[in-house]
Amino acid sequence: DGVDVATILAEKASDEAITSVSGLIRGAAGTTVTLRIGRGDATPFDVMLTRAEIVIPSVEWRMLNDTVAYIRISEFKGNTPEILATGMRELATQQPQAYVLDVRGNPGGLLDSAQAVLGLFYAGTALWEERATGVQRELLTIAPSDAFAQPSVPVVVLVDGGTASASEVVTGALRDRYPRTTVVGTQSFGKGIVQNIYPLTNGGTVRLTIAQWLTPNKSAIHGVGIMPDIIVNDDANARATVPCVANRQPADGETLCRDPQLATALGLVN
């Protein structure tokens, strides 16, 4: 099969067009796809690719400068705490004076993964689960299986409207329980309920909400979200002043990126 990338994007270079191209390119591992690529006024050319499974790590880390460590969690998977522990041990050798934890666009994932991630920062209450009956149950952080030195330096958490569910649990818990936590960005999504799915005799299903999640200080998450301590919109017209993270790319001729939320975080901890 073939995908004329040049024609599709030339007709409408939009998010919808990019999604359309992506859908056409995807397929079973081992199969091939031919792409027609156009560059400027040059004659388009064909490239045949063999499809393969792409594994995107849920955690990435780096030093942004000599003193600030950056961690991005894109999703809370089963192995996320283990990978994060590896990253934090590696970063600790460089003695960071602050951490920036980026959960922008993180849709959530496994609750026990979030509890174990919190266990890398502190021991204690991770969240409360409030049943429909009003009964509240305390859920604790999950300690790492190996010896681990929890950090004691400031943490800035970056959030936006795509920060949801388990990532909101982590954000709220760090603000409530980890000293010197500051939340920067825009209001999070506000998804914090537990639902059971029951099958119906007609083949349908019904979702029944049985509980909601509360932060350690018993603040609701669902329908409310996490309101940042410092509200910073992602302004496309901002100056390019910070290292490029979270798949951001610099503009032509530049090496830094426009990311006012990260710039604010660095201003707080530098």
Feature annotation, model-predicted:
Residues S165, P216-I221:
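Metal-dependent DNA phosphodiester-chemistry modules and their immediately adjacent helices/loops
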Residues N202-Q212:
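Short acidic, Pro/Gly- and aromatic-enriched capping/linker segments at domain boundaries
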Residues G190-K191, Q212-L214:
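Glycine-rich beta-alpha junction loops
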Residues L49-V55, Q212-W213, P228-D229:
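A short, sequence-level motif marking secondary-structure junctions
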Residues D4-L9, S14-T201:
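Cleft-lining beta-strand/loop regions that shape enzyme active-site pockets
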Residues S219-N270:
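Conserved functional hotspot residues or short segments at active or partner-binding sites
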